UniProtKB/Swiss-Prot annotation:
The keyword tRNA-binding is annotated on this UniProt entry: no
UniProt-listed InterPro entries: Wax_synthase (IPR044851), Wax_synthase_dom (IPR032805), Wax_synthase_Magnoliopsida (IPR017088)
Superkingdom of the source species: Eukaryota
Gene Ontology molecular functions: long-chain-alcohol O-fatty-acyltransferase activity
Transmembrane domains' residue ranges: 7-27, 36-56, 59-79, 116-136, 146-166, 228-248, 255-275, 289-309
Reactions mediated catalytically: a long chain fatty alcohol + a fatty acyl-CoA = a wax ester + CoA
Protein known as: Probable long-chain-alcohol O-fatty-acyltransferase 6
Organism of this sequence: Arabidopsis thaliana
EC numbers, comma separated: 2.3.1.75
UniProt GO cellular component terms: membrane; thylakoid
Chain's role: Catalyzes the final step in the synthesis of long-chain linear esters (waxes).
Topological category with respect to the lipid bilayer: Multi-pass membrane protein
UniProt subcellular location: Membrane
Amino acid sequence: MEEELKLFIQVWVSAIISVTYCYYLTPKIKTSLLRLLSVLPVCVLFLIIPIFFSTVHSSFTIAFFLSGLAVPKLILFALEKGPLFPLPPNLPHFVCFACFPIKLQKKPNPENTNHFPKWVFALKVFIFGALLLQAYHYKQFLSTNFLLGLYALHIYLELEISLTLIKFLVSITLGCDLEPQFNEPYLATSLHDFWGHRWNLMVSKILWLAVYNPIRQWRAKSSEWDRFFAIFATFLVSGVAHEILYFYLTREKPTWEVTWFFVLHGFCMAAEVALKRKTKLVQRWPVNPAVSRLLTVGFVFVTGVWLFSPQPIRHGLMERFINEDLFLIDFFNRKLYILLGLFTSL
């Protein structure tokens, strides 16, 4: 564990140095091709380093933050696009915006504004730490379907809690408002609402800038088929990216199940958008929000169990995530008891 922590620190020091190089050198290069070539060594480094970790939390964090987000951000930056362009006002801002899944909130977006009180986040932390993780102690008594539901809840809560805490700390450090990463995805009323406005919003924005927009701008007069293809291609790229993420975590040959999950969702979302744009059925016979939420979340859950979950379950990833979470909680509890003992003895 100590060696893993040392490696984790070394990687982040290397990442900061690499991003600092991009901050000072890349903007001074005039042509897009040379700027792109200047950031490629950093991108290659970020794509390689997740392989050197043994714990799934370390591998996932580095793969998600650096391989999955920092790489496309830097490529877009070299092309004078994306969240790093125009150049942030100083180096700390550039490093944070490049290395963390955050984005400066320039204008409040009503679609992404979370109107829920802060106690809702505290409730999620309680559910995750006090209920969900403890329920795994009794998993031998739980049905397979119930356990799959717990796994889905685990992925969502751990992602939202960790990313919200990072956003909070970076926001305080930089003294600026940041956009939310999640917007209560369980309230989504359609696939477009789920993927476009509620789930992992930083990733959605990067995919929009890196894949969807270039395809739509490729032709001067875009048609509905171009829109359909752009949506489908965006989900296909997301599927391949998740397949690479699974490789980092499992070190096993890809099975492409998770890619088919995103291919299916890309096709369904593209069809949904086309149906809403070309027909007036939705306006004439609107679906009750409660029903549409149930159908949307149900579709995501069922297809997730079918195509998204088999790989992590087959390779024991969820078991490793759970064991590491329980170990970390036990570690911090022991440290807390030691500190409390020191204070009470004074």
